[in-house]
């Protein structure tokens, strides 16, 4: 039985990446050591981390005046690290189009009780269960604000921002965990981008931060571990980094570049692959996708429901038994969610659609 992993993260990794990692696991390039055990100060790992950065720069067209940092703590740590480094004494706006955006705003509010800055909720679609990307009047944004924070892909609710909003000249900070490398963005449109690896980059445990040099903090922070400037100047080696995770991420970057053909080709594949499922759901009177506007649909996370919660539960159970794993929707919204990240095979979407048709015929 073929197993398809629809997990929202950690998620499917490219098979060629896993095979290469397997082949090199015990003896990395005749070093006599595994990457799991080699020093982060060794020449071998120095090449790994530098090659990882170089390939990511090429894939995303990252300009020279941006730093790339490999950190730990997941995107959730960035909810605190961003305002701690960038917002002191200023306003910071939050566009909340999903649960993770709300968590970022909530952490900022919590931090503002200790550090002097003003987090402001710019707009939210929470009242409609985040079924769309909220709009706002850019003239309401103070042009002297530190940043506008947004989430480019809402993993739980299945919405994305593809065209960046007008922010009245205020720099944009983007949480890009779940659609980085799956859609093309102009890095120069952002002051800072952060992304947890466990969806489109690699295994959980490493977080990529891309930050414009003039946006690096001037003042020392409460902790060196939470200080962008210190981390950047140390080349991601202020302390021992998650070496194996960075190595796997490098292999994924190589896969996107050499086997897929780059981000633009990857984005094309994602649009076509997700479109297969969206088209079927639209053609069905049994399944529903909750996203209000088609233009906001995610190419990575596709939530859907049947006519009842009982049928949803039955669908999940039968799907799991047939090898469609981790398709249950997030506990906050229920239903189902097909996370079809970059490494998820197109055939898995086709097989899921076949099962959905069969389930519909048997239960409508």
From Swiss-Prot:
Residues that, per the record, bind pyridoxal 5'-phosphate: 75-76, 100, 155, 198, 239-240
For the biological process aspect of GO, one term held by this record is: L-serine biosynthetic process
Q: Which residues carry this modification: N6-(pyridoxal phosphate)lysine?
A: 199
Which sites bind L-glutamate? 41
Q: Which cellular components does GO assign to this protein?
A: cytoplasm
Record's catalysed reaction(s): O-phospho-L-serine + 2-oxoglutarate = 3-phosphooxypyruvate + L-glutamate; 4-(phosphooxy)-L-threonine + 2-oxoglutarate = (R)-3-hydroxy-2-oxo-4-phosphooxybutanoate + L-glutamate
Major place of localization? cytoplasm
Q: Name one GO molecular function term.
A: pyridoxal phosphate binding
Q: Which cofactor does it need?
A: pyridoxal 5'-phosphate
Q: Which residues form a coiled coil?
A: none
The disulfides recorded in the entry are none
Task: Identify the SUPFAM superfamilies for this entry.
Answer: PLP-dependent transferases
Which biological pathway?
Answer: Amino-acid biosynthesis; L-serine biosynthesis; L-serine from 3-phospho-D-glycerate: step 2/3
Q: What keywords does the record list, in alphabetical order?
A: Amino-acid biosynthesis, Aminotransferase, Cytoplasm, Pyridoxal phosphate, Pyridoxine biosynthesis, Serine biosynthesis, Transferase
Q: What is its EC number?
A: 2.6.1.52
Q: What does this protein's UniProt record list under function?
A: Catalyzes the reversible conversion of 3-phosphohydroxypyruvate to phosphoserine and of 3-hydroxy-2-oxo-4-phosphonooxybutanoate to phosphohydroxythreonine.
Family the UniProt entry places it in: Belongs to the class-V pyridoxal-phosphate-dependent aminotransferase family. SerC subfamily.
UniProt-listed PANTHER family? PHOSPHOSERINE AMINOTRANSFERASE
Please give the HAMAP family that the UniProt record associates with this protein. Answer: SerC_aminotrans_5
Q: What is this protein called?
A: Phosphoserine aminotransferase
Lineage, highest ranks first: Bacteria, Bacillati, Bacillota, Bacilli, Lactobacillales
Name of encoding gene: serC
């Amino acid at each position: 039985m073929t197993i398809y992993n629809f997990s929202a993260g950690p998620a499917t990794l490219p098979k060629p990446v896993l095979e290469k990692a397997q082949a090199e696991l015990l003896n990395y390039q005749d070093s006599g050591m595994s990457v799991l055990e080699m020093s982060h100060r060794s020449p071998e790992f120095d090449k790994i981390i530098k090659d990882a950065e170089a390939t990511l720069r090429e894939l995303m067209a990252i300009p020279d005046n941006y730093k790339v940092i490999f950190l730990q703590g997941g995107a959730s740590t960035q909810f605190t690290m961003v305002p701690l480094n960038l917002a002191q004494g200023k306003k910071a706006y939050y566009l909340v189009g999903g649960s993770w955006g709300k968590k970022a705003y909530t952490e900022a509010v919590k931090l503002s009780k200790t550090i002097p800055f003003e987090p402001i909720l710019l707009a939210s679609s929470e009242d409609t269960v985040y079924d769309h990307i909220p709009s706002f009047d850019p003239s309401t944004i103070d042009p002297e604000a530190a940043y506008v924070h947004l989430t480019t892909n809402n993993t739980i609710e299945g919405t994305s921002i593809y065209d960046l909003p007008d922010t009245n000249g205020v720099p944009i900070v983007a949480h890009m965990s779940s659609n980085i490398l799956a859609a093309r963005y102009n890095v120069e449109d952002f002051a800072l981008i952060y992304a947890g690896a466990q969806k489109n980059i690699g295994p959980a445990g490493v977080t990529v931060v891309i930050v414009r040099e003039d946006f690096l903090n001037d003042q020392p922070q409460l902790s060196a571990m939470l200080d962008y400037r210190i981390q950047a100047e140390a080349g991601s080696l202020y302390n021992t980094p998650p070496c194996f995770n960075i190595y796997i991420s490098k292999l994924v970057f190589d896969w996107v570049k050499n086997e897929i053909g780059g981000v633009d080709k990857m984005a094309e594949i994602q649009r076509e692959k997700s479109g297969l499922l969206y088209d079927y759901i639209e053609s069905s009177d049994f399944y529903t996708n909750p996203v209000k506007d088609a233009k906001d649909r995610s190419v990575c996370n596709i939530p859907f429901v049947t006519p009842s919660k009982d049928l949803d539960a039955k669908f999940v159970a039968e799907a799991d038994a047939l090898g469609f794993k981790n398709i249950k929707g997030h506990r906050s919204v229920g239903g189902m969610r097909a996370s079809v990240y970059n490494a998820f095979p197109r055939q898995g979407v086709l097989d899921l659609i076949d099962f959905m048709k069969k389930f519909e015929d048997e239960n409508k």
